Amino acid sequence: MSNAPKLPPRPVASGFGQLPLEADRPAILVTNDDGYEAGGLIALINALRGLGRIIVCAPDSPRSGYSASFTSSRPINLSLVSDDGEVAVYFCNGTPVDCVKIALHRFFHERKPDLILSGINHGGNDSVCVMYSGTMGAVLEGCAVGISSIGFSLLNLSPMADFTHVMPIARRITEQVLANPTPRGVGLNVNIPDVAEPKGIRICRQADGYWESEYHYIEGDEQSDMSWFQVTGTYINNEPEATDTDRYWLEHDYVSIVPTTIDQTAYRHFEQFDYLVK
């Protein structure tokens, strides 16, 4: 169980205004895809205290698997939870990308945040999971507008996961990236094994894999004639012998860091498609 204290209950009123952002103090925007009351988010907030002005804008409820989607079909509401002068917490009824877009639009008119952080996710976002991840969708949104962005994920899906050992790792990486911003368009996908003492940190590439038999069909019974599909599935590693991937290092109890880019161009395969223009 997380040792981080709970955030205040849902507010009875909404409200927000311009927030003071001192020029000599780092400004950090924080979001997630598990919702503003998730233990991983609370742990990340506590890990960051003292590093600068922290603006949290997170979904009002879990939005796992929303990737880089945003809301265009309905209005989005923004509500203030608390602001103690160091950490301001808001939630909205949108996706993680909505949270980033709204926060940038509403709170960062005069200056961009120095850093966007997403997480700490309850569950891993290694290999192909990065494609579906709302945690990493928020990171890529930050990359698109030229802001150094990091996604943190713990390989533990439990809502009661213990983030005690993750907090110092997240703080250390945050401090280092504040001092050495990432190149434009590049974010970091950080996955942490669920062990008390990870063996170290490795910069690596994303593993090549996919999910098989993702949906299980459940037939209706005498209590309910409704049938449905339940998300499930088995991860298939296309390169189980590879020793330079995030999946490999996580299985060996190392923290994996994959530099991730919004540019999905397959540069190595340009010549392979010359026949299309001849």
Regions found by a protein language model. Give the residues of each.
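Short beta-strand segments
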Residues: 31, 57-59, 118-121, 152-153, ...
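A cross-family phosphate/adenosyl-ligand binding-site feature
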Residues: 3-28, 38-106, 112
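Hydrophobic/aromatic ligand-binding patch that stacks against planar heteroaromatic rings
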Residues: 138-142
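Short, Asp-centered acidic motifs that coordinate Mg2+ and/or phosphate
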Residues: 115
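Electrostatically charged, flexible surface regions
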Residues: 164-278
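Glycine-rich phosphate/pyrophosphate-binding loops
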Residues: 143-166
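Glycine/threonine-rich flexible loop motifs
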Residues: 124-133
